[in-house]
């Protein structure tokens, strides 16, 4: 897809579009896509695909994601995510809960020479990831997700063509063809 088309797609109004457009740099070659299956070793490490490591940089931030997965952000975009999650005031209970959920669980990570990254125990528990099992490492535009195989399969099995079409209409996705 050409950059102009990505710009059109990224300017859509979705529940998370404000956060996303603030964290993307405008260089669409840095966007993530694709899914890779890897195993988790007995030390809680998994491989981040080379293609993703290149875009994530030397250091990145891993935190809780929605739907029982983990989110991994490039360090260069993490400050934008943090700013968007800041509560409006010290008394903003909802904002504080969001901040606590995502920022409180955040962990700075760096891959080793084999491209493996250690998943902190708290994040493994959140995502249902266990040593010796498979995970899916999924590129999702401005971030990478890490899913336990069981949750990834369950999530995908729950989606039908009708659900996807409905979500596309709600997000006002442009028609291509």
Language model features with spans:
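Flexible "stalk/tail and boundary" regions
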Residues: 1-38, 42, 52-114, 121-177
């Amino acid at each position: 897809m050409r950059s102009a088309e990505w710009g059109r797609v990224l300017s859509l109004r979705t529940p998370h579009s404000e956060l996303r457009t603030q964290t993307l740099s405008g260089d669409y070659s840095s966007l993530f896509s694709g899914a890779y299956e890897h195993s988790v070793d007995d030390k809680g490490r998994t491989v981040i695909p080379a293609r993703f490591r290149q875009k994530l940089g030397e250091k990145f931030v891993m935190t809780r994601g929605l739907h029982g997965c983990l989110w991994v952000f490039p360090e260069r975009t993490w400050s934008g995510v943090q700013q968007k999650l800041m509560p409006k005031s010290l008394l903003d209970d909802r904002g504080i809960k969001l901040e606590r959920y995502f920022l409180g669980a955040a962990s700075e990570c760096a891959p080793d020479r084999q491209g493996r990254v250690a998943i902190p125990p708290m994040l493994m528990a959140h995502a249902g990831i266990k040593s010796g099992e498979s995970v899916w490492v999924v590129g999702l535009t401005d971030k990478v997700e890490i899913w336990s195989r069981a949750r990834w399969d369950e999530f995908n099995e729950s989606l039908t063509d009708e659900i996807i079409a409905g979500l596309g209409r709600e997000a006002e996705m442009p028609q291509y063809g």
